[in-house]
Amino acid sequence: VCLAFTVFYLPVTNNIILRMKNLNNIIKSLLPAIVSVICQCAYSQITVVDANDKLPVISASIYNGNGTDVIGITDYDGKLPKTAEQLQSIHIQHINYMPANINLQSLKDSTILLTPRTHKLPEVKISKQKDAMLRMKVYIRHMTVLNSKPAAVSESMAYLYFKENNDDGKPNSYKILSEDKFKDEKAYEGESKMLKSLADFSNPTALAFFDGYKHYNTLKGSRRMGTSWKRAGGIYYMNEDSINKRCEIVRDSLFSDKPFKVPLFGFAFSNIYNSETYSTELGTPRLYNLINMTDRYRVYQTKTMGYVDMVTEMYILGIDYASKEEMKADKKLKLSPFERPEGIVAAGDWLTTTIKGMKRIK
């Protein structure tokens, strides 16, 4: 019996081993193809580009097809968030491009073209008085999004004041001239006090950073600008490009797929001269390049996790110098009725669409 069992067992065992070897060889031959398919699935994303120069459009706001929910923003390569690709249609907003409604199901390739919308800033020559400060008149629109739902929107006209040798590029002071506020109370329902506080109205100039190539053209590589508070988990860098006469802010967030960059062109408020010309010789400044910052504050809680997105867009309307007497007079100005500047906000963009479902706050 033992002999018979041995004779029967050996052929079966050898047959199994032979089959396992064949299977192993097949797997090895298919492994590169399998890995290639997996990589393509993981990294294949739809890209948003400029219709003229085909360069990636960075930090474009992505909404669902109805424009009611914020999905996210495009990264430094212009790629859509992966969650957006799962939708049938999306709505895209960018301060320097025409709004676009895209049906992803009928998209022929993986590229979305946006049509540029430029706002020219004329060349201005100004003379500085003693102890004067640079005064910039701006139009600001600010939106907070609480867990993907627009919660508060404000529009403001303001003066920003910069001292000589301003190293950080932020305004030293500001004066709100007029403003309009809208709020959706339903967006706050069921949220924590912390999130409600973050989503409520705040200083619209808080994200204003202005720094051009003049102050940073002596730097090589990147300069760390600062680290935001722990919950935000963000680090800012300023990269300098002396060849193209520009620099860019890099924000590296713990909650982003990869760092995104905000390019800045032409303007510097450090080393102000007695007479200085803000020139367009390097090309017409695109206003969104001066300020179009988005920031995310994410709050962790015991049972739930929520977040608030803050989006600020700022348009430059005028630049001059203001003496001490003029600044004192500015501070005494009372709020005037808000009037939106003509030719800036396109009809049907995210602002006009969002405030339709909100209540005006006095």
Regions inferred by a protein language model and the residue ranges of each:
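Short, acidic Ser/Thr/Gly-rich low-complexity loop/linker segments typical of extracellular
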Residues: T68-K79
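Short Pro-Gly-centered beta-turn/loop motif in secreted/extracellular proteins
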Residues: L80-Q88
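A short, solvent-exposed loop/turn motif at the edges and junctions
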Residues: H91-I102
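Hydrophobic beta-strand segments
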Residues: A60-N64, I90, I126
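Bacterial Sec-dependent N-terminal signal peptides
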Residues: V1-T47
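Surface-exposed, low-complexity/disordered segments
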Residues: L113-K362
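A short, amphipathic beta-strand motif
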Residues: I46-N52, G78-K79, I112, V124
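Short, ordered, surface-exposed loop/turn motifs in non-cytosolic proteins
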Residues: N52-N66
